[in-house]
Design a protein with these regions (language model features):
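Noncatalytic regulatory segments and standalone regulatory/sensor domains
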Residues: 31-129
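Active-site-adjacent substructure of cysteine-protease-like catalytic cores
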Residues: 1-40
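Canonical tetratricopeptide repeat
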Residues: 133, 166, 200-201, 234-238
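Helix-start (N-cap) detector for alpha-helical repeat units in TPR-like alpha-solenoids
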Residues: 94, 128-129, 161-162, 195-197, ...
Length: 242
């Protein structure tokens, strides 16, 4: 990352989201080796002429957050500069296929998405992102094969939040509430404020297991981390009845 910055190319990295956004892209503008910090552009909370501001993240915190999504980085720059970095061709192609597969998924081209991700895994069997995305596509079809792909993703990257969340969602759909709770909990242990709706899901599976106090706490956290949730009123009424 620092090598790229030193070459004058501001990399775009994939980082965890907040509230009801599970992921976001951020431009890294620099670093400070003395202070051990990373500089990145973040959107202004209030409209302004520039619309962006520079944020500072402690280096260790940044590394932890970046690792949750496989340390993905997008580089935009002159071909001669990019090629001088001498990236692993198979890894680069594998990561590119991951981005292309997400586009195919949005276009509802499921078969093409699966083929693209399988090719990504063939090119780089250690690509935790490709394995997790493939698990996600199969999960949408309620295909139990998704479990093995999520588990392989976690073997490659123990901090893969989305793999644990995906397992939690799969087991919830199949009413295996104890397994669902376990995986949601693992995700929350990795990052407790990345995605507010995960608390609603864990609250539901705990409620189904008659863990009412824990369920209530999860619903409260859902409102805390997702204050603008469309179903906030319904959740608050449910809390009053619990």
């Amino acid at each position: 990352l620092k090598q790229v910055i030193d070459m004058g190319i501001p990399p775009i990295v994939i980082l965890p989201g907040l509230r009801d956004i599970v992921q976001h892209a951020s431009i890294i503008s620099g670093y400070d080796d003395n202070e051990k910090t990373i500089f990145h552009y973040v959107p202004e909370q209030k409209p302004s002429e520039e619309g962006i501001q520079v944020g500072v993240i402690p280096e260790k915190r940044f590394e932890k957050l970046w690792s949750e999504d496989g340390c993905l980085m997008v580089l935009l720059g002159p071909t001669d500069i990019i090629s001088s970095l001498k990236p692993d061709e198979n890894k680069t192609k594998s990561n590119r296929l991951c981005f292309e597969s997400e586009r195919l998924s949005i276009q509802k081209q499921t078969e093409e998405t699966i083929n693209s991700l399988k090719k990504a895994v063939e090119l780089n069997p250690n690509n935790s992102t490709a394995l997790c995305l493939l698990g996600g596509v199969l999960n949408e079809q309620n295909n139990p094969d998704c479990v093995s792909y999520y588990e392989k993703s976690l073997e490659k990257n123990k901090n893969c939040y989305l793999a644990y969340r995906g397992l939690g969602n799969f087991y919830l759909k199949n009413q295996q509430f104890d397994k669902s709770e376990k995986n949601y909990t693992h995700a929350i242990e990795i990052n407790d404020n990345r995605f507010g709706p995960i608390y609603k899901n864990r609250g539901y599976v705990r409620q189904q297991q008659s863990k009412m106090d824990q369920a209530k706490e999860d619903y409260q956290n859902y409102i805390k981390f997702t204050p603008n949730a469309k179903d906030r009123g319904m959740i608050e009424r449910a809390l009053n009845e619990m």
